[in-house]
Protein backbone atom coordinates (compact mmCIF):
# COMPACT_ATOMS: atom_id res chain seq x y z
CA UNK A 1 0.00 0.00 0.00
CA UNK A 2 1.36 3.41 -0.92
CA UNK A 3 0.95 6.54 1.13
CA UNK A 4 0.45 9.95 -0.43
CA UNK A 5 2.42 11.65 2.31
CA UNK A 6 3.73 11.36 5.85
CA UNK A 7 0.49 12.62 7.39
CA UNK A 8 -1.54 9.93 5.66
CA UNK A 9 0.95 7.33 6.87
CA UNK A 10 0.70 8.55 10.47
CA UNK A 11 -3.09 8.62 10.34
CA UNK A 12 -3.17 5.06 9.01
CA UNK A 13 -0.83 3.80 11.74
CA UNK A 14 -2.88 5.53 14.44
CA UNK A 15 -6.07 3.99 13.05
CA UNK A 16 -4.46 0.54 13.08
CA UNK A 17 -3.50 0.98 16.74
CA UNK A 18 -7.02 2.23 17.52
CA UNK A 19 -8.49 -0.89 15.92
CA UNK A 20 -6.25 -3.16 18.00
CA UNK A 21 -7.31 -1.41 21.20
CA UNK A 22 -11.00 -1.65 20.31
CA UNK A 23 -10.62 -5.37 19.58
CA UNK A 24 -9.07 -5.81 23.02
CA UNK A 25 -11.84 -3.81 24.69
CA UNK A 26 -14.69 -5.73 23.10
CA UNK A 27 -13.35 -9.01 24.44
CA UNK A 28 -14.55 -7.80 27.84
CA UNK A 29 -11.82 -9.54 29.83
CA UNK A 30 -10.00 -6.51 31.22
CA UNK A 31 -9.60 -5.38 34.78
CA UNK A 32 -10.83 -1.88 35.58
CA UNK A 33 -7.38 -0.28 35.54
CA UNK A 34 -6.47 -1.72 32.16
CA UNK A 35 -9.87 -0.75 30.77
CA UNK A 36 -9.37 2.84 31.90
CA UNK A 37 -5.85 2.92 30.46
CA UNK A 38 -7.02 1.70 27.06
CA UNK A 39 -9.92 4.16 27.03
CA UNK A 40 -7.41 6.94 27.68
CA UNK A 41 -5.22 5.62 24.88
CA UNK A 42 -8.22 5.76 22.53
CA UNK A 43 -8.84 9.37 23.49
CA UNK A 44 -5.20 10.18 22.80
CA UNK A 45 -5.26 8.45 19.43
CA UNK A 46 -8.43 10.29 18.43
CA UNK A 47 -6.88 13.60 19.48
CA UNK A 48 -3.74 12.85 17.46
CA UNK A 49 -5.76 11.88 14.39
CA UNK A 50 -7.79 15.08 14.64
CA UNK A 51 -4.61 17.16 14.87
CA UNK A 52 -3.18 15.39 11.82
CA UNK A 53 -6.37 16.03 9.84
CA UNK A 54 -6.31 19.69 10.89
CA UNK A 55 -2.66 20.03 9.84
CA UNK A 56 -3.36 18.37 6.48
CA UNK A 57 -6.22 20.80 5.85
CA UNK A 58 -4.05 23.79 6.75
CA UNK A 59 -1.31 22.56 4.43
CA UNK A 60 -3.82 22.20 1.58
CA UNK A 61 -5.10 25.72 2.15
CA UNK A 62 -1.62 27.29 1.91
Model-derived regions: residue spans:
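Short, charge-rich amphipathic interface segments used for partner binding and complex assembly
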Residues: 23, 27-60
Amino acid sequence: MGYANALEYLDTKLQEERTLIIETLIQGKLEEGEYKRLCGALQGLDLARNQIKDLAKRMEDE
